[in-house]
UniProtKB/Swiss-Prot annotation:
Assigned protein family: Belongs to the ligand-gated ion channel (TC 1.A.9) family. Acetylcholine receptor (TC 1.A.9.1) subfamily. Alpha-5/CHRNA5 sub-subfamily.
Name of the protein described by the UniProt record: Neuronal acetylcholine receptor subunit alpha-5
GO cellular component terms, semicolon-separated: acetylcholine-gated channel complex; neuron projection; plasma membrane; postsynaptic membrane; synapse
Region of interest (Disordered), ranges: 1-26
Length: 454
């Protein structure tokens, strides 16, 4: 009986077995990497500075990349940032020949397993001086690249003079905590802070961020450090809409108090309401800015000035209302100089309608009424009655004219302080904004021109 040919199973031929021949290659690479780690870290001491000679200096290329400006706490004078510390140095004890280890040119090693420079942020405010324990990239020639992400809270002296149109200069100072310059030297990699992955902040904008290297001498040793200066500008739109404009509006609202008639009781109510509103705004600013007696923000000075302004308007309004309700029965006769100034001179200067002074109007001359012995008694009685009525009417006219004169003086006072307070409000507002415009022109414009030229 002829042997029946066995059916060949799918995938059982040489072509199907070919991929299995390459299965050993990844295993070989893995074994080579394992062998490389054993070779590098056998008897390795991560606390020993990796140099061939004791006097050799390890040069650290240092750079900074910022990913986010998280917050600027003006009250506590802190700047919170998310940064990446770019560090690179040569480790003479971590070198190998790639040909001996399946062509491996780089490996990833945890940072807490090898020697790393103890570069910290000197002006740290939360006690966290070290970076995050992330892996380092070790190349075959001994070059180590380590870029740990760090969340820093650094101290920043806040200058609130031009709040909310202020620019702050916050610095971050990095250096070795234990090594001097002869052991570990820091080389500034980039003059500019890397902002390619920067996430914009809704309140602050980074104008410039530059680095510089310096040295601090302490006795026989010198200590290198790198300082990064961040010039940040506050975006003032929010505070302009909800703080500056209402404050200016309240100051000009005070001017309208003098436009109300003097007999209106709402004048005092309006002044008091404005004063309370300004007090609330002042408390809001006090919650934002740091408690310092060195610098007072311009907006704070403007609010205090406006509060004094409103207080004076209340005093003047009370005085004007008192004058408005004066009469000959409650006060003495008006002094001649008061009449001359407030009834004749000031109305012309204030473009007011001339007030006709009738108080000293020449009285009609009394007619000579020669008594006739032959006049009747009834005629004399009638004349006496007419004289009495005339005197009574003239007296009432005089009293009414005195009251009208005092009312007109109150109107003159209101008009005079209306123009005076309006002028002072405009000048105060200009004094607030002119220094801000000058400050921005001296800083923002050169930076913008420089960035355009580059």
């Amino acid at each position: 009986m002829p042997l029946r040919a066995r059916s060949r199973k799918p995938g059982a031929g040489p072509a199907a077995r070919a991929p299995q021949a390459g299965v050993s290659e990844p295993s070989f690479v893995a074994k080579s990497e394992d062998r490389l780690f054993k070779h590098l870290f056998e008897d390795y001491q991560r606390w020993v500075r990796p140099v061939e000679h004791l006097n050799d200096t390890i040069k650290i290329k240092f750079g900074l990349a910022i990913s986010q400006l998280v917050d600027v706490d003006e009250k506590n004078q802190l700047m919170t940032t998310n940064v990446w510390l770019k560090q690179e140095w040569i480790h003479v004890k971590l070198r190998w020949n790639p040909e001996d280890y399946a062509g491996i040119t780089s490996i990833r090693v945890p940072s807490d397993s090898i020697w790393i420079p103890d570069i910290v942020l000197y002006d740290n405010a939360d006690g966290r001086f070290e970076g995050t324990s992330t892996k380092t990239v070790v190349k075959y020639d001994g070059t180590i690249a380590w870029t740990p992400p760090v969340n820093y809270k650094s101290s920043c002296t806040i200058d609130v003079t031009f709040f909310p149109f202020d620019l702050q200069n916050c610095s971050m100072k990095f250096g070795s905590w234990t090594y001097d310059g002869s052991q570990v030297d820091i080389i500034l990699e980039d003059y500019e802070v890397d902002k390619r992955d920067f996430f914009d902040n809704g309140e602050w904008e980074i104008v410039t961020a530059t680095g510089s290297k310096g040295n601090r001498t302490d006795g026989c040793c010198w200590y290198p450090f790198v300082t990064y200066s961040f010039i940040i500008r506050r975006l003032p739109l929010f505070y302009t809409l909800f703080l500056i404009i209402p404050c200016i509006g309240l100051s000009f609202l005070t001017v309208l108090v003098f436009y109300l008639p003097s007999n209106e009781a709402e004048k005092i109510s309006l002044c008091t309401s404005v004063l309370v509103s300004l007090t609330v705004f002042l408390l809001v600013i006090e919650e934002i800015i740091p408690s310092s007696s060195k610098v007072i923000p311009l907006i704070g000075e403007y609010l205090v000035f406006t509060m004094i302004f409103v207080t004076l308007s209340i005093v003047i309004t009370v005085f004007a209302i008192n004058i408005h309700h004066r009469s000959s029965s409650t006060h003495n006769a008006m002094a001649p100089w008061v009449r001359k100034i407030f009834l004749h001179k000031l109305p012309k200067l204030l473009c007011m309608r001339s007030h006709v002074d009738r108080y000293f109007a020449q009285k009609e001359e009394k007619g000579n009424m020669s008594g006739s012995e032959s006049s009747r008694n009834t005629l004399e009685a009638a004349l006496d009655s007419i004289r009495y009525i005339t005197r009574h009417v003239m007296k009432e006219n005089e009293v009414r004219e005195v009251v009208e004169d005092w009312k007109f003086i109150a109107q003159v006072l209101d008009r005079m302080f209306l123009w005076a307070f309006l002028l002072v409000s405009i000048i105060g507002s200009l004094v607030l904004f002119i220094p801000v415009i000058h400050k921005w022109a001296s800083i923002i414009v050169p930076v913008h021109i420089g960035s355009t030229n580059t």
